[in-house]
């Protein structure tokens, strides 16, 4: 891929349904991927296993959005025992950090005190969110980040959550696999949707009582582009089906759906 490949080229790739990867974190080259079959997480059928619902109800981590984007990408690219090598190299970190500064890439972070213990990142275009990678340094941290992401996407009017490939880790959340043509048809429709990751939606009004606590809760960062407080209403619904829950509204609503 050309050394001149920049953020605008990356956005153009996503609009076409392709995405970049590297052979390894030490290889500076990138290549484009256009899978024959695509893994997606249908937002209207997002499933949370019962054990994880109980875990989310316990509010074990403080969850934030876009407060440590580059740290999340770098953590996703760290090798570990089960994954000695990764596809996230320095050009990937730099490209997605540039998209984040432009407002097109976002992260979800899970914190235990001041320690970043899990999270994920991806790209937002129209009503589509393209999940890129996730990491976990504590029990269920990446899963909880994904639940909060799904709740936010539902709350903000998104219609497509792309997981790129079939991943056994994600089948518990309702992952399905569709053909390339079917994915691109869904993508074409999703790009016409005016969803906003940090803006309002046509749904219920935000619960302005949701904020940040030292041990748990949900928070937004504040940037010059402007970010609204996280309502949590979609997640409330998903949780509520599994029993009483006093946490964020979006968490409760999304568990009602499960």
UniProtKB/Swiss-Prot annotation:
One of its GO terms (biological process) is protein catabolic process. InterPro entries: Acyl_CoA_acyltransferase (IPR016181), Leu/Phe-tRNA_Trfase (IPR004616), Leu/Phe-tRNA_Trfase_C (IPR042203). SUPFAM superfamilies: Acyl-CoA N-acyltransferases (Nat). One of its GO terms (molecular function) is leucyl-tRNA--protein transferase activity. Transmembrane segments: none annotated. Belongs to the L/F-transferase family. This is Leucyl/phenylalanyl-tRNA--protein transferase. It comes from Hyphomonas neptunium (strain ATCC 15444).
């Amino acid at each position: 891929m050309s050394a001149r490949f920049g953020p605008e080229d990356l956005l153009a790739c996503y609009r076409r349904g392709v995405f970049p990867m590297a052979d390894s974190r030490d290889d500076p080259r990138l290549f484009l991927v256009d899978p024959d079959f695509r893994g997606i997480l249908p937002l209207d059928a997002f499933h949370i296993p019962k054990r994880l619902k109980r875990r989310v109800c316990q509010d074990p981590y403080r969850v934030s959005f876009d407060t440590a984007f580059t740290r999340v990408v770098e953590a996703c690219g760290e090798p570990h025992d089960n994954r000695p090598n990764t596809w996230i190299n320095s050009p990937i970190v730099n490209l997605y950090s540039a998209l984040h500064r432009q407002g097109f890439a976002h992260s979800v972070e899970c914190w235990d005190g001041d320690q970043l213990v899990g999270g994920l990142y991806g790209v937002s275009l129209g009503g589509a969110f393209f999940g890129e990678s996730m990491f976990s340094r504590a029990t269920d941290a990446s899963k909880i980040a994904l639940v909060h992401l799904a709740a936010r996407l539902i709350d903000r009017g998104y219609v497509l959550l792309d997981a790129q490939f079939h991943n056994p880790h994600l089948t518990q959340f309702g992952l399905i696999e569709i053909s390339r043509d079917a994915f691109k048809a869904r993508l074409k429709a999703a790009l016409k949707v005016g969803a906003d990751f940090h803006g309002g939606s046509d749904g219920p009004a935000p619960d302005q009582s949701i904020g940040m606590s030292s041990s748990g809760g949900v928070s937004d960062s504040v940037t010059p582009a402007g970010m609204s407080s996280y309502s949590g209403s979609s997640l409330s619904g998903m949780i509520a089906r599994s029993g009483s829950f006093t946490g964020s509204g979006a968490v409760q609503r999304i568990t009602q759906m499960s």
